[in-house]
Every structure is written in structure tokens, then in C-alpha cells.
Amino acid sequence: MDTQAFKRSLHHSDRYNRRGFESPAKRAQALEKAYQSNLIASIRDNGYLLEHGRLRVKLAEAFGFCWGVERAVAMAYETRRHYPTESIWITNEIIHNPSVNDHLRNMNVRFISAEKGIKDFSSVEEGDVVILPAFGATVHEMKLLHERGCHIIDTTCPWVSKVWHTVEKHKKHEFSSIIHGKVKHEETLATSSFAGTYLVVLDLKEAQYVSDYILGKGNRDDFLRRFSRASSQGFDPDRDLKRLGVANQTTMLKSETEEIGRLFEKTMLRKYGPAELNEHFLAFNTICDATEERQDAMFSLVDEPLDLLVVIGGFNSSNTTHLQEIALAKGIRSFHIDTPERIGEIENTITHKPLGDDLRVESNFLPEGKINVGITSGASTPDRIVEHVIQKLINLSERKLMTEN
């Protein structure tokens, strides 16, 4: 399928909207009223530092809502204001934040149900309004909704769209796309639908496995088994790993994406030589600015003298998970929570999600005496949620101090 031609056709439809309905000023005002925090603004103005009694809170210097998320959330809310009585659907979570998605449900925005990863669009009717989330949607989903006569409101982050253009460029020039991402993540599913021949690698370890195969060190049957659900239909490693371009899920760890890019460049250089490199490898630049800023700020934060760190964001949020990885790699006692309610003020507990594990309750969360706490949040977390977490910490520190006295 010519995905570029389809996008051009869709974008010219009078039932397609990617600009929203309200002025930027009105949109910003509505979002500020819903999610911004005076406390967080004052902490920013104070060098990202709050001192209260025995508690010292240090915020990362870049955290929370990014521009793409703000745009998506604002467009979703204004869609309901523009269509006050129509049936409105969304193909997935607008962003990976439970409070924001619950707010949409309270506005009677319905979420497309899915069974074993297969979405059920049978209840969506002609004339219904359908919102595409910040992660985007697959070509198949967009085509289905367009042909059904739905009004499509596209909140896809422009950085995600940039990755789509990259893999389409690979396809046009007959390069296979190596996509650094999580194979079942909504964004990677959307990106791969715009690609031609593709392979999804989760991390540097998987990328190294592919590199070894290119250099003649792998087994074909093992390769096909390993990537059976992470490659385009009919992918042939002996045919399709000769010309490669690299792209990424925008929320992956920046340093790892860059390392994977360098690995494949060196691999193709070793196999084909410098004179032929450009015929076998396409350089890339699909790293999201906001992801990069938040990860860089996290690397700075973990260099502070911290007793513990709280990372706030949806448990299915890729960018939040990578922030937690940075903290743990530094050896800091760090907790990933999705809502302020995970902190038990009376019991001094925190219910958190360790990497790759189920929820766990930690007792004696806040230690005695003076304490330095670092805080950051993923790109889908509003400032007001961060404020509520800080208030919980303040209350807990005061309660524990009163108990000690």
C-alpha cells in the first residue's frame, strides 16, 4: 500500500482534522485550568527546590507534560466541547496517564475495546467522531475509520509523524527499517504499519544479535523464531538485512537508540566497506527532543545527594519506565508510582511497580531525620499530579515527625 498517497488523501478529507477547533490561547487556558500547579511553578522559580521542615525536594529540571502530550490532551477535550452530543470514540488511551484517561471517560468519550490485542470497531458508526491518540494509529485503523465515514480527530504527536516519514523514506529507497522499540507498544505498531520491510529490536542485546547474524554468526531458524512477532510478514534475514535504516519509538532511551544506530553503521561498514556504506545504511535522527530533555534532566538529578527518588507516570508509559531505569542504574532507592494515592500517609508505605514486576508495597517508605527526595515525572503526567505527590510527602514527613516527638 502507498501509505504516503493514503495520508495525502486523508488529510484533504473534510472529515479529517489535525489542527483542533480552538485558538492556541483558549486551548492553553483550558489546559492550565485543568492541570497546572502554582506550587510546581513556585518550585521551578526556586531552582527546582522545595525545603519544608525535614524534607528537601529536588525536582528534575525537565519533567511532566511535553508539547505533544499537551496538544493531544487539549485537542481531545476541545473535541467534546465542539461535538457536545455526538458519539466520540478514542482508539486507545490518549496518553499513558490514568487520571487523564479517566477524565475523558467522565466526558463520555468511549474507548475502543480490544481482545488479545485486536481492537473491535464494530460499534463505531458512520458520522461518529473518533480521536487518534498521541501515539498515532495504524494505517489499517485510519483506513477503516475513513471508509466508514467517521470524523477523524488526529492528535498524533508531530515527532511520531516524523518517524513515520523516516520509515516511509526507507521503504521508498528499498531499505529495511530497524525500529528500536517495544513490539506491542501503540506507537511502534503504528510506525511499523507505515514501514515496508521492518524488524523491531527491543534493546542493544537484540540489536547485537541481529548484527552478529549480518556478519555470518547466527542461525537462520533461531533468528526467525526469535523475531517471528517482531518483523514484517515474510521477513527474510538473508535478503532483508542487506540495506538498513534505523528509526525508533520516540520514548525509548536516547543513549541506547544512538548506540544501536552506531552498531548497525559499524556492522554495515565492516561487511561492505566505506565505499559502499551509503548503499547499505541510512543515518537517522528520530529522537524526540522532549524525551531527550527529560532523560538528560534525570541524569543530572541522580547526581544530586538523594536518599530516595519518586518517578511518577503510568505503569505502561515507556518514557517513564526509562526514567526509572536511569535511577536504578545509579543505585538510588527509587519508586515508580502512577498516582499520588500510592503513598500511604498513615502507614508510611508506598505501593510501587518495580521494573518488570508486579505492584509491591514498601514499608517504612520515608526514613527518619532529614531527607532528600528527588522527583521526576513522565511526559504524560500533569503538574497537578506532581503537586499532589509532593503534598503527600510533606504530610507524611510532618506526621512521622510528630510521631517521633
From Swiss-Prot:
[4Fe-4S] cluster binds at C66, C157, C288. Belongs to the IspH family. NCBIfam families: ispH_lytB, PRK13371.1. It comes from the Bacteria. This is 4-hydroxy-3-methylbut-2-enyl diphosphate reductase. GO terms for biological process: dimethylallyl diphosphate biosynthetic process; isopentenyl diphosphate biosynthetic process, methylerythritol 4-phosphate pathway; terpenoid biosynthetic process. Isopentenyl diphosphate binds at H96, H185, S317, S318, N319, S380. GO terms for molecular function: 4 iron, 4 sulfur cluster binding; 4-hydroxy-3-methylbut-2-enyl diphosphate reductase activity; metal ion binding. Dimethylallyl diphosphate binds at H96, H185, S317, S318, N319, S380. Pathway: Isoprenoid biosynthesis; dimethylallyl diphosphate biosynthesis; dimethylallyl diphosphate from (2E)-4-hydroxy-3-methylbutenyl diphosphate: step 1/1; Isoprenoid biosynthesis; isopentenyl diphosphate biosynthesis via DXP pathway; isopentenyl diphosphate from 1-deoxy-D-xylulose 5-phosphate: step 6/6. It is an enzyme of class 1 (oxidoreductase). Its EC number is 1.17.7.4. Binds 1 [4Fe-4S] cluster per subunit. Keywords: 4Fe-4S, Iron, Iron-sulfur, Isoprene biosynthesis, Metal-binding, Oxidoreductase.
